[in-house]
A protein has these predicted regions:
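N-terminal pre-domain/capping segments
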Residues: 1-96
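Hydrophobic faces of well-ordered beta-strands that scaffold small-molecule active sites
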Residues: 3-10, 37-39, 66-70, 106-108, ...
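Active-site beta-loop-alpha junctions enriched in small/polar residues
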Residues: 8-12, 40-44, 71-75, 111-113, ...
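Distinct, well-ordered alpha-helical segments
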Residues: 16-26, 48-56, 118-137, 153-171, ...
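Acidic (Asp/Glu)-rich catalytic clusters
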Residues: 25-33, 47-67, 93-102, 133-141, ...
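Active-site acidic/histidine proton-transfer and metal-coordination neighborhood
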Residues: 60, 77-177
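Acidic/histidine-rich catalytic cores of soluble enzymes
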Residues: 132-229
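C-terminal helical cap(s) of enzyme catalytic domains, especially alpha/beta-barrels
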Residues: 270-285
């Protein structure tokens, strides 16, 4: 059974241990027993093809699976056509970079729905996504898996149901289930095993068992407000906001899933990814 754990970007300890270069990341991850890494391009895809390939070779040597977080500027549901077109270009840039790294998955945000209805926003996002997939095909990136992410703020497009609906567009799309975001936008709604089981069942019922088994995920504890949702990312030391990883680990075992779980803790993402792996292994005992 292949399951992948790793961080989103580097923990504070990466530089503290004297590491400086991207090519040193796989060696750094090895000490934690991790086998995944999500390269961060939230502020734009700025890595060259050559540097991406060099990083990818170092990752492959340590059997690290690479994914990439596409720019935050992406807004598939924007009312401005210019921004929707730019979003397609950002997706193309992300695909090019992750392919150079030897990866296939890119995580994208869907956009906002603060000025229009959620249904109108979903319609715009779906239309933009179809155009993006066509552009990926034309560019020769038809094997890139686009992973729309569940979002933490209430006025963002990205409920579980909206993300799953987006993924019905094409089988190459995989949902990125951010459990911390879902907990934040439901004001602490993920507590019991049944709460998490419902997420897994929703994916399976709408997208089928094969895509459930390979789903992409972000996990962190997140502080939230009672009117807007997500406020800020925390570490696993938090005992107030949650969610806890144990019900996720149990659900993964019960459904025989093989996901990629990326930790987005604030500054301790590698350390907390290792804790998630330990929780997962203990759940299977």
């Amino acid at each position: 059974m292949s399951i992948y754990f790793g961080p989103a970007g580097n923990s504070v300890s990466f530089a503290a241990q004297g590491y400086k270069k991207n090519t040193q990341i796989p060696e750094y991850l090895e000490q934690f027993g991790l086998n995944a890494f999500e390269y961060q391009c939230g502020r734009g895809v700025k890595i060259s093809d050559a540097s991406a390939a060099e990083f990818g070779a170092a990752a492959a040597a340590k059997n690290i699976q690479i994914s990439l977080h596409a720019p935050y500027f992406i807004s598939l549901s924007s009312l401005e056509e210019e921004k929707r077109t730019a979003s397609i270009n950002y997706i193309l840039q992300s695909a090019r970079a992750v392919k150079a790294m030897g990866g296939t998955r890119i995580v994208v945000h869907s956009g906002s729905c603060s000025k229009i209805s959620r249904q109108e926003a979903l319609h715009l996002a779906s239309d933009t996504m179809r155009k993006a997939l066509a552009a990926l095909d034309e560019a020769g990136f038809d094997d890139v898996r686009v992973c729309p992410e569940t979002m933490g703020k209430v006025n963002q497009l990205g409920t579980l149901e909206e993300v799953v609906e987006l993924c019905t567009i094409d089988e190459r799309m995989i949902p990125c289930i951010d459990f911390g975001h879902l907990n934040a936008r439901t004001f602490g709604g993920l507590k019991t095993f049944a709460d998490f089981e419902n997420i897994f069942n929703t994916i399976e019922n709408k997208l089928g068992n094969s895509r459930l088994k390979e789903f992409h995920s972000h996990f962190s504890k997140i502080e939230y407000t009672q009117n807007g949702g997500e406020k800020c990312h925390l570490t696993f030391d938090d005992t107030v906001f949650g969610p806890n990883f144990e019900p996720v680990a149990e659900s993964i075992y019960q459904k025989s899933c093989e996901p990629t779980i990326i930790c987005e803790s604030s500054g301790t993402q590698a350390e907390d990814a290792a804790k998630m792996k330990a929780i997962y292994l203990a759940a299977g005992v």
